[in-house]
């Protein structure tokens, strides 16, 4: 079941491009709810959506993945490991690794991402 679930979530997530994280997360969430699976949405926020402070840069891609200060994905426990699925990591990635992929200007100024988790 876990391999099948991961494959189905990956198929959903792979349909979305950069800057479509919200729609991607909603689609995955709806899929899981329809199957009676409770998980959570994980959101990161730079603290500002204005100008350069709203940019979220992805280290592996070498480019911005958000200009509104926000990005989100869905956390799913598979084989005891919490994986995040989003429009960039459609195969799923461990949560701490996912969080470590992002950069924003606030980090250089001593700030950090605001992280919110909402169960569904």
How should these model regions be labeled?
Residues 1-120:
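A structural boundary/capping signal
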């Amino acid at each position: 079941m876990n391999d099948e679930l991961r494959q189905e979530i990956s198929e959903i997530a792979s349909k979305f491009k950069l800057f479509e994280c919200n729609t991607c997360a909603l689609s995955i969430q709806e899929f899981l709810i329809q199957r009676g699976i409770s998980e959570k949405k994980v959101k990161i926020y730079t603290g500002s959506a204005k100008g350069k402070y709203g940019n979220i840069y992805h280290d592996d891609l070498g480019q911005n993945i958000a200009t509104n200060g926000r990005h989100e994905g869905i956390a799913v426990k598979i084989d005891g490991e919490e994986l995040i699925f989003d429009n960039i990591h459609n195969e799923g990635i461990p949560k701490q690794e996912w969080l470590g992929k992002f950069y924003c200007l606030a980090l250089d100024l001593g700030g950090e991402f605001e992280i919110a988790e909402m169960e569904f």
